[in-house]
């Protein structure tokens, strides 16, 4: 899944480099389900994709985009430090390194059950606490 922002020339190159059993697409409806069902995932470190990965027990290797911002690299390093994903820099993501990682990853699952996933409910509670009327009926 190349993503909707990949330019046409890069998409054509990716398609031409793909092997006979590989399909390159821009988008993939139902990606969360495919991540859950996959033996392993190699991905860039975009926010939405990483959230989908963290919701599954699929082993994941994140190869973060390093320019124009370090956002993905920072995210990948933090998650790797918590032993939730593996990460490689773009320079280290050679075919050999990717193959080595895949060979080990496809026989395992990653336990991410310790991740607190109640952020939406916690945010709603915090907002309600901040705007709840005080004893005089005034908003705090």
Explain the meaning of each model-derived region.
Residues 13, 37, 78, 97-101, ...:
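Alpha-helical elements of Rossmann-like donor-binding domains used by nucleotide-donor carbohydrate transfer enzymes
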């Amino acid at each position: 899944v190349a993503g909707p922002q990949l330019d046409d020339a890069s998409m054509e190159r990716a398609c031409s480099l793909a092997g006979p059993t590989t399909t390159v697409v821009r988008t993939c409806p139902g990606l969360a389900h495919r991540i859950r069902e996959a033996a392993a995932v190699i991905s860039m470190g975009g926010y939405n994709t990483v959230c989908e990965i963290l919701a599954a027990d699929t082993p994941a290797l994140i190869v973060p985009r390093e320019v124009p911002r370090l956002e993905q690299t920072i995210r990948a390093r933090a998650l790797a430090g918590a032993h939730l994903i593996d990460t490689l820099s773009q320079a280290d993501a050679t075919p050999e390194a990717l193959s080595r990682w895949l060979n080990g990853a496809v026989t395992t699952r990653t336990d991410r059950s310790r991740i607190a996933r109640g952020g939406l409910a916690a945010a709603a509670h915090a907002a309600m606490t901040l705007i709840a009327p005080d004893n005089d009926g005034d908003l705090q």
